[in-house]
Amino acid sequence: LELVLDDRIVIKGIQTDRIGTNWKFISNKLLSNNSYKLRLMSEGEGIYKSWNLKTFPSPEAQVENVSIMSFTCAGGPEGFKIAGKEFFKPFRFRQKVFDEGLSMNPDFAISIGDHIYWDLRGQNAPQIGRKNKLIKFFLGSYIGLVYGSFNRSEKASSSKNEKVLKNIGNEQIASLYGTRFKSTPIFFIPDDHDYFENDDAEK
């Protein structure tokens, strides 16, 4: 993949996964406080409509005003209810919050974790429910079937573990955010659940 800026600056993509669905683009040719039109290309063909993105002012610049959009704990799968109890907000609810914030044209956004809710509790897959062993078994088996289970004897970057990680991240991050922030720089700050555990003490 290539990222083309203003039809003149070409940035070669760097593939970061095995099958070519994750890429990063790095360039030192951009000017500070400048707006660019971006196009994503593959073998000379555009694969997404062009969009605009503005770089930050230089570190030495005297900035008079800055608008920041910030939110926390947006992670989790699509929301659902069981016996009247809500587990996570629906995607459309969270996306409405995103859209409301973006409508104010912030200069950048900060997404503070948790971005992922998938506490392993020392296992290969989440143990849903803390008391009922039957619930743990059936829901844990279902989750392992749908998303896969981590293999702790392999590296985190192994083919199997990468696939499980992407199954989780694609649902809780990629499907949630989509391309909403393509013209707004966004920084992700991890919290405890993003390391697949909750740091709260529990018996």
Stretches with model-predicted labels:
Residues 1-203:
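Divalent metal-dependent phosphoesterase catalytic cores across multiple superfamilies
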